[in-house]
Amino acid sequence: MACVLAIGSILFVWILGKGKYSGAQLIYRMATNFAISQGCCLVTCACELTEEIKHLHTRYNGHYWRALKASFNLSCAAFVTAILCYVFYEPKLMASLPLTIDITLTLLSWLFCWILGIQGPTPATISEITEIKQLNVAHGLAWSYYVGYLQFVLPALKESIQKFNEENHNLLKFPETCRLHILIPLSCRLYGDLKDVDENITFLKEIPPLYIDRAGIKGRVFKNNVYRILDEDGRPYNCIVEYATPLASLLKMTDIPSAAFSADDRLQQTKLFYRTLKDILENAHELQNTYRLIVYEDFPETKDHSRHLLSQEILKHIRQQHSEEYSML
């Protein structure tokens, strides 16, 4: 359809301008219109860059070059055209054209951009559209995790902890430990036992399971585990910890060629999963003080990376919650 419109526009300009304007004048005007339109796009991209810089660490890991590439999608053809217009400028080329021809030439320049793929949405714009319209993989995973799991488990957590404490001498006696601590590693690597990744974390016990009839399964079981975590001085802390299981899907997608899902895509989707889940839970006011999201980087770039990263991250959040509880008293 774009090619048909382009051919029609060329014929229209040729009919109206035949014998009145030279081909050089018409081409020069179309080139200047193209350069001006690309200049407007350049300003728009600069505005997008200022917005992306605000999210430099959450979206691009602090890399300015990645933010720059995501914000700009201009072809070198725009700059070459602008230079050629300047080099070959002559007053006679800037003829005063009728409004109909001028508008048609402007339309024609946009059509050529579209046909040749010179102008298109930037990666940042595409990301914004898919995020707003909830077209990302992460949105579906976050909502599925909430409506299919957290929406059942979190409201019942308080009662399950009470039963657990009655049977186990109040092992979870502090408010900051009576929450479900959800681990969100940016690498998406999940382990069956947390001790496999950090020897300062050991499985202690299960809290009483939750049974729900769901999706044709009678008495479907939802379990949560209590882990004992040792700090740097060997002092024990007990809390309920588990991974956000949908992250395993993101990791598997990277290994499936047909998914066309790169490691960078996985990282961006993991961050979006966290932001989406955070928004969902914050809007579920009845679930306040029943969970804690722990997002952390677990792909070390240096050899002196701590072997106790996970226990340190969990303890940091437990202490933060303790100070928050204390400040509210």
Swiss-Prot record:
Pfam hit, one: STING_TM
Binding site residues for 3',3'-c-di-GMP: S144, Y149, R220, V221, F222, K223, T245
Catalytic activity: H(+)(in) = H(+)(out)
A Gene Ontology biological process term: innate immune response
Cellular localization per UniProt: Endoplasmic reticulum membrane; Cytoplasm, Perinuclear region; Endoplasmic reticulum-Golgi intermediate compartment membrane; Golgi apparatus membrane
Region described as Cyclic dinucleotide-binding domain (CBD): 135-325
Gene3D superfamilies linked: 1.20.5.5200, Stimulator of interferon genes protein
Lumenal face residues: 26, 89-98
GO cellular component terms, A-Z: autophagosome membrane; cytoplasm; cytoplasmic vesicle; endoplasmic reticulum membrane; endoplasmic reticulum-Golgi intermediate compartment membrane; Golgi membrane; perinuclear region of cytoplasm
Cytoplasmic topology ranges: 1-4, 53-74, 117-329
Gene Ontology MF, one: proton channel activity
Keywords for this protein: Autophagy, Cytoplasm, Cytoplasmic vesicle, Endoplasmic reticulum, Golgi apparatus, Immunity, Innate immunity, Ion channel, Ion transport, Membrane, Nucleotide-binding, Transmembrane, Transmembrane helix, Transport
Regions that span the bilayer: 5-25, 27-52, 75-88, 99-116
Annotated 2',3'-cGAMP binding sites: S144, Y149, R220, T245
InterPro entries: STING, STING_C_chordates, STING_C_sf, STING_LBD, STING_TM
Subunit structure comment from the entry: Homodimer; forms a homodimer in absence of cyclic nucleotide (c-di-GMP or cGAMP). Homotetramer; in presence of cyclic nucleotide (c-di-GMP or cGAMP), forms tetramers and higher-order oligomers through side-by-side packing.
Domain notes: In absence of cGAMP, the transmembrane and cytoplasmic regions interact to form an integrated, domain-swapped dimeric assembly. In absence of cyclic nucleotide (c-di-GMP or cGAMP), the protein is autoinhibited by an intramolecular interaction between the cyclic dinucleotide-binding domain (CBD) and the C-terminal tail (CTT). Following cGAMP-binding, the cyclic dinucleotide-binding domain (CBD) is closed, leading to a 180 degrees rotation of the CBD domain relative to the transmembrane domain.
Homology family: Belongs to the STING family.
Annotated protein name in UniProt: Stimulator of interferon genes protein
Organism of this sequence: Xenopus tropicalis (Western clawed frog)
Primary gene name: sting1
